[in-house]
Amino acid sequence: MDTPLDELQWKSPEWIQAFGLRTDNVLDYFAESPFFDKTANNHVIKMQRQFSQLPNNGAAAGSMNPETMRDAHSEDMGQEQEFSYVDPIRRAILEKYVVHAFLERELMKVRGIEYVLANVREPDFWVIKKQRRTSPTAIEPLQTYYIVGANVYQSPTVFKIVQSRLLACSSHLSATLAELNNLVEFKPSQGVQYKNILDMPVTTRKTGNTANVGSVPGTISASLNMPMVNTGRLNSAGAATIGTSGVPNSAGMTGANTMATGQTGATSRFENGSSRSSTDAISTDTLDKLLITSMKSTPEYI
């Protein structure tokens, strides 16, 4: 068979339909599977009982009667000492199911490979253990099998369990390293470093700080969050402001108020007829703020 036994699932619905599946005959059902070794002592004992000259019909009938077998074994006061070498779970199984206790006594008489019922969770779960008996009370476990419902499985080895866990860990680590590799960038001035996704790109910050730096003072003030002075006519309250012509207005006409600081200021320096250059239109405070902004900006190396 090319398929490994630990990757094989076996079941026989026909056998279950004919005989049923319960704790008394679960070993007989397991003996039909490819996991069972035909040279095991269980098969030898079964053949001996089948072709024995002893009258086994009555014994077989009695084995199917739990009350009769329980009364027979209740007379055996040394049963606990007889099966003292097995674990408490198996000892409870041998005390409850007389068929398995009879098989255990027969297996104690021979040496070699054998199959025993190790655990029961009725009505649909059994654990069968393959072991090698070296003496009546000394056994060596070899393999474990599970019967879940009608399906029979072989338990995986420790090597394959560890191999599967390591393979899963390495797969997740490879995926993580691939994601981290996408977050690495290289700059000749700074070398290899990780990208900071929360920060804005340098080009965006540069554009936001230095856009529209021209000869129009109002635009410069707006981009630097500084007071922006708009010229216009008098508001309805009659507050005196100086327009673009430099002549105070006294009429109660609506106009644009001074923004950002809530204060009105003279804009005579921005008059149309002024002979001053555009550089003189920027005040000393504005130049200082421009200098501080340029010092705080991130340098870009070429």
Curated annotation (Swiss-Prot):
Gene3D superfamilies: Mediator complex, subunit Med6. The keyword Transcription applies. Its main location: nucleus. One of its GO terms (biological process) is RNA polymerase II preinitiation complex assembly. Transmembrane segments: none annotated. GO terms for molecular function: transcription coactivator activity. Belongs to the Mediator complex subunit 6 family. This is Mediator of RNA polymerase II transcription subunit 6. The lineage of its organism: Eukaryota, Fungi, Dikarya, Ascomycota, Saccharomycotina. The gene is MED6.
